[in-house]
Amino acid sequence: QCTENGCIFSDDAVNAFVAKAKEADGYIFGTPVYYAHPSGRIQSFLDRVFYSSGKHFAHKPGASVAVARRGGTALNKYFGITQMITVGSTYWNQVHGRNAEDAAKDLEGMQTMRNLGHNMAWVLKCLEAGKEKGLVPPTADRSNQTNFIR
């Protein structure tokens, strides 16, 4: 039911997000990291978003940003399973700091964020140029799918 009609709660933030996300050209999701994983809040939210509406993200660029050092890359898994284009940078898309002032002092992390922004802009321009030339995304073969048990 969720994949056909969206989430069943009419006032659900997932439905509101998906309505806006359908119109977006690309996405950057950010999260703090706890125990080497994204926060449970964003992971639960994105589980529901991508399970109910993953088809709306196909062939669009996405990136995730983690506030930590060397952890939190699980958000990138959503991009692969929905045929998104994963945008990278010059290092893992992470910055370290307990608050905005601390993060601003992470020179390598801030450099990585700037490069991520430049790369995202470039990918979006490439996609637009492809559309102007008549290029269309490939159609996925979905003839063989394993259920959640196997």
Predicted features by range, described:
Residues 1:
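Short, flexible, mixed-charge acidic loops at enzyme active sites
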Residues 4-93:
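Helix-loop-strand module that forms the ligand-binding subsite of alpha/beta enzymes
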Residues 10, 85-150:
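Glycine-rich phosphate/pyrophosphate-binding loop and the adjoining helix
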